[in-house]
C-alpha cells in the first residue's frame, strides 16, 4: 500500500431532525447567503420554503441563483460568481444534488478571482486554495460532492467537462436527510446509484494497484450497500433505511476514506465525461452503459482475479474454479444490475449518439499518456469501448 494523508474537515449533519442546525452553521461565516439550486424540485417538495424560512428567520440576507443544469455549465457558475462579487456574499448554500453542489463550488472558487471566471481555473488544472465557504443540503445520493474536494464543470462551447479540485472546495458542512430524496424520480435514483457504485469500482477497487484488506473490504461494503438498497428505494421511494444507506454510501464513496493507500484511476469516469461534454447525457447513465463494456474489454488472465472477486464479494456469486469464468459472471452481474435492476437503457445509439465524435473524445480523454487502471488504455482502445456501447 502507498503512504497517504487523510483530511476531511466537512461536518455532516445526518438524519431527520438536523435542519435546525442550518442557521447556526451559516452564521459561522456571515449573514449574506447565496442560495444555489436547480430546476425547481425543491419548491415542489417544500424544501425551498423551509430553507428560506430558516435563513431569513435568523436575520440573514438571502440571494438566489436557480436553474443549475444537470451538467453544470461554467457560464452558470460565472453568473453566481458575479452575484457574489456584487452582493458581497459571505457563504454559499447549495440545496440539491451533486450538480448543484458542484456549481456552488465553482462559484465559490471563481468569486475570489479578479475576473470571476471559473473556466481558467478548470482548464489550467488549478488546485484551489481559497474559496468562499459552501454549505450543502443534499437531496440526491449520487456524486459525493457533499463531502469531497472536487467539482466537475462543463463548457458546452468547447465540448469539455473537467474536474476542479482543492481543499478549499470541501463543504464546511453537509446536511443529509434521507427524506429529502423521497420524491426523486426513479430514473434519477437509478442513475445516482450507479454513479456511487462506479465511484468505488472505477476510482479505487479496480485501479490496478493492491490495497490493504481493510480498505478493500470497506470498498466492497459500499458497493454491496448500493446493490442491496437501490432496488428497495426504487420499489419503495419513501423507505427511509434504503434512502439512508444510499445517501451515506454517496458520501463515503468520495470523501477520501476509501482511497487510503490506493491510486486513483477513473477510466470510466474519464470516458463518460466526454460523453456528457458532447451529448449532455446523465452522468450515471453514461457510466452504467460504459462500465460492463469496459470490464469486458479489459478482461484477460491478469485482470480476471480482481473482476472475479468483485462478483463473489459484492454480488454474492459462488466461487468459480476458473477465474476467467468467474470474471465473466461478475461482468454479467454488473450488466444485470445496470440494465435489469436499475432499468437503464443499455445502448448509446438509443440515446441519439453515434460514433461521429468518438475519435476526438478518445484523444481528449487519453491525452499524451493514455488512461491508467487495471489495464492501460490508448486512443484506439477507448474508441473500441465506445463502439461496444452503441
Question: Where are each of the predicted segments found?
Answer:
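Glycine/serine-rich anion-binding loops at beta->alpha junctions
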Residues: 89-105, 139-145, 278-281
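Short alpha-helical scaffolding segments that buttress acidic/His motifs in well-ordered protein cores
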Residues: 197-201, 243-254, 291, 334, ...
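A glycine/threonine-rich phosphate-anchoring loop and its flanking beta-alpha core
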Residues: 10, 112-211, 305-309
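Active-site segments that bind and position negatively charged phosphate/pyrophosphate groups
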Residues: 207-333
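C-terminal charged capping/lid subdomain of soluble metabolic enzymes
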Residues: 307, 314-390
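Short Gly/Thr/Asp-enriched flexible loops that form oxyanion-binding sites at enzyme active sites
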Residues: 50-51, 79-81, 100-114, 147-148
Amino acid at each position: 500500500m502507498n503512504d497517504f494523508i487523510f483530511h476531511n474537515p466537512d461536518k455532516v449533519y445526518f438524519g431527520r431532525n438536523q435542519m435546525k442546525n442550518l442557521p447556526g452553521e451559516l452564521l459561522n461565516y456571515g449573514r449574506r447567503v447565496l442560495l444555489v439550486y436547480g430546476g425547481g424540485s425543491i419548491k415542489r417538495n417544500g424544501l425551498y420554503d423551509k430553507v428560506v424560512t430558516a435563513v431569513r428567520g435568523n436575520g440573514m440576507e438571502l440571494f438566489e441563483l436557480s436553474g443549475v443544469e444537470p451538467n453544470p455549465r461554467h457560464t452558470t457558475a460565472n453568473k453566481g460568481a458575479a452575484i457574489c462579487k456584487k452582493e458581497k456574499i459571505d457563504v454559499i448554500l447549495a440545496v440539491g444534488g451533486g450538480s448543484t453542489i458542484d456549481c456552488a463550488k465553482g462559484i465559490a472558487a471563481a468569486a475570489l478571482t479578479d475576473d470571476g471566471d471559473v473556466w481558467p481555473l478548470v482548464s489550467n488544472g488549478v488546485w484551489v486554495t481559497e474559496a468562499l465557504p459552501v454549505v450543502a443540503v443534499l437531496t440526491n445520493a449520487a456524486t459525493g460532492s457533499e463531502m469531497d474536494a472536487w467539482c466537475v464543470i462543463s463548457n458546452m462551447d468547447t465540448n469539455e467537462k473537467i474536474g476542479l479540485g482543492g481543499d478549499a472546495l470541501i463543504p464546511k458542512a453537509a446536511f443529509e436527510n434521507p427524506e429529502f430524496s423521497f420524491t426523486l424520480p426513479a430514473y434519477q435514483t437509478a442513475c445516482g446509484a450507479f454513479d456511487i457504485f462506479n465511484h468505488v469500482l472505477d476510482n479505487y477497487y479496480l485501479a490496478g494497484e493492491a490495497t490493504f484488506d481493510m480498505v478493500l473490504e470497506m470498498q466492497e461494503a459500499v458497493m454491496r450497500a448500493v446493490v442491496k438498497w437501490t432496488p428497495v428505494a426504487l420499489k419503495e421511494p419513501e423507505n427511509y433505511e434504503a434512502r439512508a444507506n444510499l445517501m451515506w454510501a454517496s458520501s463515503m464513496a468520495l470523501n477520501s476514506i476509501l482511497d487510503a493507500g490506493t491510486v486513483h484511476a477513473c477510466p470510466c469516469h474519464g470516458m463518460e465525461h466526454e460523453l456528457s461534454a458532447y451529448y449532455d447525457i446523465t452522468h450515471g447513465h453514461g457510466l452504467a452503459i460504459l462500465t460492463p463494456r469496459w470490464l469486458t474489454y479489459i478482461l484477460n488472465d491478469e485482470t480476471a482475479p480482481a473482476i472475479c472477486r468483485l462478483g463473489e464479494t459484492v454480488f454474492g456469486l459462488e466461487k468459480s474454479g476458473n477465474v476467467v469464468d468467474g470474471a465473466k459472471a461478475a461482468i454479467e452481474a454488473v450488466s444485470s444490475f445496470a440494465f435489469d435492476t436499475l432499468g437503464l437503457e443499455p445502448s448509446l445509439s438509443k440515446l441519439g449518439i453515434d460514433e461521429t465524435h468518438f475519435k476526438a473524445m478518445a484523444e481528449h480523454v487519453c491525452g499524451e499518456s493514455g488512461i491508467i487502471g487495471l489495464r492501460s488504455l490508448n486512443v484506439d482502445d477507448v474508441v473500441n469501448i465506445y463502439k461496444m456501447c452503441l
